[in-house]
């Protein structure tokens, strides 16, 4: 057995006594629970106590930082985990090593039913982890954040700064909040205002209150005026609506009957209406003339015969050429129409009809009118009238379009 020269004999005896005490303690304690069986690795020292409202758990975790510890509640079990990297060097040779040197540990504690995991308070300070667990019911799973004394102080400073900034912004938007801020700050931050600060807040409160009352009075008067103005607008709009309804189907022309622009527009509309009336009369005349020409062409036997005569000469030469009989332009007997005489004396011969007349000639005297020349002139006059009608119709349509465009332009520029 090797003896360590750095170890004192009485210290060795003390270590042996400690080992015997731990062994006897394990024999006298009950069997390990499920929570104890869940532990592994290095086991930090832990105390568990309670009062009527809380459970308190204290663990000794020397040389640990709060970032290396994880506390979590899962159902009835409180889980505490930690891991620390072991740093070993070859420069030093250890003769005794009792301090925690690194690795991973896990402690689990079984708690009664109804633990409020969301309300657990954790504090880590000077290598000691303190957990306060309320006995009331709550969430069954919760991750607990740890704050040491230094972290608590820093967070308190941050909260105070945030409250001051919020106070400044609120007072800028509403001066009346200057007095009420003291009560709100004492509630939020947990600190009470001293007399000096209270006096500072009390001084501008009276003037701020007067200012707020004046602003509220002005706002109320403005709303009253606004409501009154809206009522007047509604009444005027109702009057205008009733008046416009009484004007009939065309209220725009009635509203400004005496204006120059309206009179000019009315005059142009009247001209356009008269032009439409004249155009309709002209169209009726043109339709009658076109029907007349159409009937003439239809009864003449075609356009080829219109160039020579308006009737069938073969019918005349077969029994009616011996008497002085008057024929109309359709080859029928008619004394009322401008006729012509048929005699034996021939002044004009039409050899083109010799075959149809059996070799005889036809003489048309000057007592009526010569069928070929006079009838062609009559037809030509009708065709010329039809052509002029069409030209006039196009001209009238162009005039009507120009007049309508002028009316539309003037209506667009008119102010009603």
Swiss-Prot record:
Region annotation (Disordered) ranges: 216-235
Domain of life from the UniProt record: Eukaryota
All residue ranges annotated as the sHSP domain in the record: 37-150
Record InterPro entries: A-crystallin/Hsp20_dom, HSP20-like_chaperone, Small_HSP
GO cellular component, one term: cytosol
Keyword Transmembrane helix: no
Keywords: Stress response
Signal sequence bounds: none
A Pfam family reported for this protein in Swiss-Prot or TrEMBL: HSP20
Family from the record: Belongs to the small heat shock protein (HSP20) family.
PANTHER family per the UniProt record, alphabetical: HEAT-SHOCK PROTEIN 20 FAMILY MEMBER
Protein's name according to its UniProt entry: Heat shock protein DDB_G0280215
């Amino acid at each position: 057995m090797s003896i360590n020269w750095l170890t004192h004999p009485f210290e060795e005896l003390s270590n042996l006594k400690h080992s015997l005490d731990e062994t006897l303690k394990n024999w006298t304690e009950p069997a390990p629970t499920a929570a104890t069986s869940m532990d592994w690795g290095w086991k930090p020292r832990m105390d568990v106590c309670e009062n009527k409202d809380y459970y308190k758990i204290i663990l000794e975790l020397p040389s640990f930082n709060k970032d290396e510890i994880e506390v979590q509640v899962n159902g009835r079990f409180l889980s505490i985990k930690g891991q620390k990297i072991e740093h070993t060097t070859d420069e030093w040779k250890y003769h005794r090593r009792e301090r925690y040197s690194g690795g991973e540990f896990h402690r689990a504690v079984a708690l009664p039913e109804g633990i409020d995991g969301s309300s657990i308070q954790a504090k880590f300070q000077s290598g000691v982890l303190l957990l306060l667990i309320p006995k009331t019911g709550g969430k069954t799973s919760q991750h607990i954040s740890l704050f040491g004394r230094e972290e608590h102080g820093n967070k308190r400073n941050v909260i105070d700064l945030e409250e001051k900034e919020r106070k400044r912004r609120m007072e800028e938007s509403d001066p009346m909040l200057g007095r009420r801020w003291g009560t709100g700050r004492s509630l939020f931050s947990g600190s009470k205002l001293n007399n000096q600060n209270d006096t500072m807040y009390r001084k501008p409160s009276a003037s701020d209150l007067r200012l707020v009352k004046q602003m509220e009075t002005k706002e109320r008067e403005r709303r009253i005026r606004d409501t009154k103005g809206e009522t007047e607008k509604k009444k005027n709009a109702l009057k205008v609506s009733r008046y416009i309804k009484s004007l009939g189907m065309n209220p725009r022309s009635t509203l400004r009957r005496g204006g120059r622009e309206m009179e000019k527009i009315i005059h142009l509309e009247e001209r356009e209406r008269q032009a439409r009336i004249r155009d309709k009369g002209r169209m009726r005349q043109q339709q009658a003339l076109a029907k007349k020409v159409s009937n003439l062409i239809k009864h003449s036997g075609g356009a080829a015969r219109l160039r020579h005569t308006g009737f069938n000469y073969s019918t005349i030469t077969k029994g009616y050429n011996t008497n002085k009989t008057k024929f109309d332009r359709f080859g029928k007997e008619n004394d009322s129409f401008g006729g012509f005489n048929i005699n034996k004396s021939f002044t004009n011969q039409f050899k083109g009809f010799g075959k149809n007349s059996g070799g005889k000639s036809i003489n048309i005297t000057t007592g009526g009118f010569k069928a070929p020349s006079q009838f062609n002139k009559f037809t030509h006059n009708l065709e010329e009238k039809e052509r002029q009608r069409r030209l006039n119709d196009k001209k009238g349509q162009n005039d009507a379009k120009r007049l309508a465009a002028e009316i539309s332009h003037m209506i667009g520029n008119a102010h009603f």
